[in-house]
Design a protein with these regions (language model features):
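Conserved phosphate-binding/catalytic region of the ribokinase-like
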Residues: 197-299
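Short beta-strands and strand-loop turn motifs
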Residues: 101-103, 128-134, 162, 180-185
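Hydrophobic alpha-helical segments and helix pairs
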Residues: 108-123, 127-152, 158
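Charged helix-capping and loop-helix junction motifs
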Residues: 115-118, 142-149, 195-201, 236-241
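Glycine-rich phosphate/adenosyl-contacting loop at the front of the ribokinase-like
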Residues: 1-56, 64-66
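Gly/Ala-rich phosphate-binding loop of Rossmann-like dinucleotide-binding domains
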Residues: 47, 153, 262
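Conserved N-terminal subdomain of the carbohydrate kinase-like
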Residues: 24, 48-128, 295-299
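Conserved phosphate/ATP/ADP-binding segment of small-molecule kinases
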Residues: 146-230
Length: 299
C-alpha cells in the first residue's frame, strides 16, 4: 500500500483574468478549484496511474471537510487527523499576464494531533511505501520528518522524501528509498552552482553516499537524471509541449516514478515519472492518464 502525508492540505482557488489591476476591482474570466498539498497531489496522480493510495495528514474546519469529501469523490482513500480548531487553508492563485499567488497559513497543529498521526503511521507494514512531501508548518516540530523515519526505521518500508535543504539532509541517515531534489536545490544543499551534467552527477552521488538509496534529479528543460540503488546512472529527456502550469509537476513526477517502480524497473520508472511531470506541466490541472500515456510513448 502507498501512503502519502500532507501536513498542510489546501483548496487551491485558481482565478483567470485578462488583466490584474492592483487597488481596483477585478473580475475573473473563469475559476477552478483544486484540492492540493504535495502529498495529495501525489495521491491524485497515482490514482490516474491505477495505483491505490491513502492520504494522511491534518485537516480542519469546513475547508478540511471539503478536501476530504472531494478526494473521496475522486476515489482516493483518506485517513486525516481532524483538528479541533481553525480551517484548512485556501490558496488563491491569480493567472493573468503574470501569475500571482496568495497562500493561506493553515491551522495550528498541536502535540496531540501529531501523536495521532504517529499512531496511524505506526500501523504501516513491511512492503508499504510512504511518501513525505513539502514544507513543514510553523506549528510542527522542525524535525518531524526525522521523527517519522526514525519510528519506521525497523520496518521494511520504502520511504520517499520530496523536500529540500536541511529537511532532506537530516533524513539521509535513515536511508530513504528515493529523494527528488531539482538541480538548483541540489546545488543549494552543497553551496555550489551546478552548470553541467557531470557536476550534477557528482553531487547526486554525494547524497547517495550520505544514505539515499535512489537519487532522482529533475533538471527542467534538461530532463532528469537517476542514480539508482546499484549506482547506475539513468537519463531521460524532456517531453515536448507548451507549459501551462508549474504547480504539481514535481509531485506528479514522484507519483509517476513510484508507480513505475511498483510496476517495472528503474528505466521505466524514470520515463513514467518524466511523462507524469510533463502531463501536469502541459495541463491546467494535474496529469491525467491519457496525457501521461501519450507523452510516455515519446520518451
Amino acid at each position: 500500500m502507498v501512503y502519502t502525508v500532507t501536513f498542510n492540505p489546501a483548496i487551491d482557488y485558481v482565478v483567470h483574468t485578462g488583466e490584474m489591476k492592483l487597488g481596483s476591482t477585478n473580475r475573473s474570466d473563469r475559476e477552478e478549484m483544486y484540492f492540493g498539498g504535495k502529498g495529495i497531489n501525489v495521491s491524485i496522480v497515482l490514482r490516474e496511474l491505477d495505483i491505490q493510495s491513502k492520504a494522511l495528514g491534518f485537516t480542519a474546519g469546513f475547508t478540511g471537510e471539503a478536501i476530504e469529501n472531494g478526494l473521496a469523490e475522486m476515489g482516493i482513500d483518506t485517513d486525516f487527523v481532524h483538528l479541533q480548531n481553525g480551517n484548512s487553508r485556501i490558496n488563491v492563485k491569480i493567472k493573468s499576464a503574470e501569475e500571482t499567488e496568495l497562500n493561506g497559513q493553515g491551522p495550528d497543529i498541536d502535540d496531540e494531533a501529531v501523536n495521532k498521526l504517529f499512531a496511524k503511521l505506526d500501523k504501516l507494514q513491511d512492503g508499504d511505501t510512504l511518501i513525505l512531501a513539502g514544507s513543514i508548518p510553523a506549528s510542527l516540530p522542525s524535525d518531524i520528518y526525522e521523527k517519522i523515519l526514525e519510528r519506521l526505521a525497523h520496518k521494511n518500508i520504502r520511504t520517499v522524501v520530496d523536500a529540500t535543504k536541511d529537511l532532506l539532509l537530516n533524513v539521509l541517515k535513515y536511508k530513504p528509498f528515493l529523494i527528488k531534489p531539482n538541480n538548483h536545490e541540489l546545488g543549494e544543499m552543497f553551496g555550489v552552482t551546478l552548470t553541467n551534467d557531470e557536476e550534477i552527477e557528482k553531487y547526486a552521488r554525494k547524497l547517495k553516499e550520505m544514505g539515499a538509496v535512489n537519487v532522482l534529479i529533475s533538471m527542467a528543460g534538461d530532463g532528469a537524471m537517476l542514480i539508482d540503488e546499484n549506482g547506475e546512472i539513468h537519463r531521460c529527456g524532456v517531453c515536448n509541449g507548451k507549459v501551462k502550469n508549474s504547480v504539481g509537476a514535481g509531485d506528479s513526477m514522484v507519483a509517476g516514478f513510484t508507480a513505475g517502480i511498483l510496476q517495472g524497473d528503474y528505466e521505466y520508472a524514470l520515463k513514467l515519472g518524466t511523462a507524469a511531470g510533463g502531463a501536469t506541466a502541459f495541463s491546467d490541472g494535474l496529469a491525467q492518464k491519457e496525457k501521461i500515456a501519450e507523452l510516455l510513448e515519446t520518451l
